[in-house]
A protein has these predicted regions:
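Active-site metal-binding motif and surrounding structural segment of the metallo-beta-lactamase
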Residues: 49-51, 58-103, 202
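Divalent-metal (often Zn2+) His-rich catalytic cores of metallo-beta-lactamase-fold enzymes
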Residues: 188-245, 251-252
Length: 268
């Protein structure tokens, strides 16, 4: 399989959002940058005149925009795979919805439901707070949709997805040059081990629902950042000192609200 760099894509400006299209030959990956208020990303996988979406937009204008894009492709829409982002259920109404039982629970009763409630309060009528109803539960560790095999990796909240045919992984968050939520040292170690696993497997591209497409160099950058967080936490006695030290080392990083949350976890 030919390796594709994260910059090897064509870009389609949809008005609000951007579509970055990666051509793997038999399979195309359409990475949708929503440009919404929570920097969501969604991923359309296309093969043999069929397609499905990994995660979905949750603002009504993005929903309309993406539906029009998919219609314009002239493909048969085979369903929506919902892992970490359960809101936006008006998208492609009537299409199959795939999820695991733990992800469905997370979206309807767990932390995902709480986030949706908060977003609905913050964003009002522009936000589609309706939660997807799962029509097709994924009970095994593999599933095939639109002729594309997916490997399912259950996580604490939901699940990650590997697409072996194009050597791509989808996980909730990475973001190599921004702060992210790190819930203490054990969580940092878990993320490091996860990213090292991607490196060992030689994964081509890493997809996440809050950042543009990334690669293994980005994974290495994130590992170094996480190691630094652990070191800085060991050297500082208060959350405030920790945040100052991290910001000094990573002054260009966005996501200071996530750094605040991380500090709260490290200094309980």
């Amino acid at each position: 399989m030919a390796k594709i760099e994260k910059t090897q894509h064509t870009t389609v400006n949809l008005g609000k959002g951007l579509m970055e299209v990666y051509d793997f030959g038999a399979v195309k990956l359409h990475a949708y940058k929503t440009n919404d208020l929570i920097t969501d990303e969604c991923f359309l996988i296309e093969k043999n005149g069929k397609g499905f979406l990994i995660e979905a937009p949750c603002f009504f204008d993005n929903i309309k925009e993406l539906e029009a894009y998919i219609k314009g492709l002239g493909i048969s829409y085979e369903g929506t795979v919902i892992a970490y982002h359960g809101a936006g259920a008006s998208f492609m109404k009537g299409a199959p919805v795939y999820s695991t039982r733990n992800a469905d629970e997370y979206s309807h009763k767990g932390g995902g439901a709480a986030l949706v409630s908060n977003f609905a309060g913050a964003f009002g009528d522009s936000f589609d707070s309706s939660i997807y109803t799962t029509t097709n539960f994924i009970d095994g560790n593999t599933i095939t949709i639109a002729d594309v095999k997916l490997n399912i990796d259950i996580t604490t909240e939901a699940f990650d997805i590997e697409i072996p045919e194009i050597n791509v992984i989808y996980t909730h968050m990475l973001g190599h040059d921004c702060h992210s939520i790190v819930a203490g040292i054990s969580h940092a170690d878990a993320i490091i081990n996860q990213l090292k696993g991607y490196i060992e497997k030689g994964i081509n591209l890493i997809l996440t629902s809050h950042y543009t497409v990334e690669n293994l160099d980005d994974a290495k950058t994130k590992i170094a950042y996480l190691d630094d967080l652990k070191r800085i936490a060991a050297e500082n006695k208060t959350a405030e000192d920790f945040k100052v030290a991290v910001q000094k080392k990573y002054s260009g990083y966005s996501g200071l609200n996530y750094l605040d949350m991380t500090a709260g976890f490290f200094y309980k």
